[in-house]
C-alpha cells in the first residue's frame, strides 16, 4: 500500500520543469526581471525540455516564447486528455507525452468521480500546455543544470473559486475496496484546497516522488502586466454530465436524504 506521505505522485511532476541538483546555482528573479517577461494570450512562460536531472525527471527551459500550432495528430492527442486546450499550445510532444504518462497514476484514485478527475486533469493540462500559459505562470527562479538554464520555481495563479471547486469535487472520492478517501493518497489528507495546493507545490528531493520544482499557488495576479489567474470551468461532483456515485459525492442533489425517501414512496405507491 502506498504511504500517503510518499505518494506525491509523478502526476505532479508532469510539467517537466525541475529544479537543478543541489550543487547547481539557483538565480532568484527580482521584481524588475519578472516585469521584463511578457504576459498575455498566446504566449508561453516556459517551453521545451532543457535536460534531465540525475533521477531522470525532465526539466523545462525558462524562456518565454509565442505559443505554437501543433500538427493534427498532436492536437488530437492533447484533446483526448485536455479538452480545454485547443488551437495553439505551449508544450512539445515530448512534454505532453510525459504529462500523459504521469497523470495516468492518478486515474485509479480519482476515476470513481469523473468530475473530480476532470478538474484535476485540467489543473495540470492548463499548466503544461495552455497557449495562454504566461497569463497565469510566472517563472520566479532559474536553476543551472549542466550549464543549461532551467525553471527552478514558478508562481501559478489560480482563482480561489477553481481551487475550492476542485477540492469539493474530490474530497469524498473513495479509493478501492478499503473505502479510503483518495485525497489521503493524492493530497496527504488535505482539509481544504490551500492545503492540497501546498502539498502539490512542495519540492521533492531527488529520487523521491513529488514535484522536482517548487510551485507557489497564488490568486493575486498582477493584471497591470497582463496576468490573470487560471479559471477554466470546474465541475461539481453532482454535475449530471460527469456524475459521481453517492459514495463519492454525498452532497449531490440526487444523494440527499429526501431523494431515497421520495424514490421509496414511488415504489410503494405502485
Locate each region found by the language model:
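Cleavable N-terminal signal peptides of Sec/SRP-targeted secreted and luminal proteins
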Residues: 1-20
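Cleaved targeting-peptide boundary
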Residues: 21-25
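Extracellular/luminal segments of secreted precursors and ectodomains of membrane proteins
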Residues: 32-65, 70, 74-86, 95, ...
Amino acid at each position: 500500500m502506498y504511504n500517503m506521505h510518499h505518494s506525491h505522485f509523478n502526476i505532479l511532476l508532469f510539467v517537466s520543469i525541475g529544479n537543478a541538483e543541489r550543487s547547481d546555482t539557483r538565480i532568484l528573479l527580482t521584481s524588475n526581471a519578472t516585469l521584463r517577461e511578457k504576459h498575455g494570450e498566446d504566449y508561453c512562460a516556459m517551453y521545451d525540455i532543457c535536460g534531465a536531472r540525475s533521477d531522470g525527471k525532465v526539466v523545462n527551459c525558462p524562456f518565454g516564447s509565442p505559443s505554437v500550432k501543433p500538427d493534427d495528430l498532436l492536437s488530437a492527442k492533447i484533446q483526448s486528455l485536455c479538452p480545454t486546450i485547443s488551437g495553439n499550445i505551449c508544450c512539445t510532444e515530448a512534454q505532453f507525452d510525459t504529462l500523459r504518462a504521469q497523470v495516468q497514476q492518478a486515474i485509479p484514485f480519482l476515476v470513481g468521480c469523473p468530475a473530480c478527475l476532470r478538474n484535476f486533469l485540467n489543473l495540470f493540462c492548463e499548466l503544461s500546455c495552455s497557449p495562454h500559459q504566461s497569463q497565469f505562470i510566472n517563472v520566479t527562479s532559474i536553476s543551472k543544470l549542466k550549464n543549461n538554464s532551467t525553471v527552478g520555481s514558478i508562481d501559478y495563479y489560480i482563482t480561489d473559486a477553481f481551487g475550492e471547486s476542485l477540492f469539493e469535487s474530490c474530497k469524498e472520492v473513495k479509493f478501492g475496496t478499503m473505502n479510503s478517501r483518495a485525497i489521503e493518497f493524492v493530497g496527504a489528507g488535505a482539509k481544504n484546497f490551500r492545503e492540497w495546493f501546498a502539498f502539490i507545490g512542495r519540492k521533492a528531493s531527488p529520487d523521491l516522488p513529488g514535484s522536482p520544482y517548487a510551485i507557489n499557488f497564488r490568486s493575486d495576479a498582477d493584471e497591470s502586466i497582463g496576468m490573470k489567474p487560471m479559471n477554466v470551468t470546474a465541475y461539481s461532483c453532482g454535475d449530471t454530465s460527469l456524475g459521481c456515485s453517492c459514495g463519492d459525492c454525498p452532497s449531490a442533489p440526487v444523494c440527499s436524504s429526501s431523494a431515497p425517501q421520495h424514490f421509496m414512496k414511488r415504489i410503494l405507491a405502485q
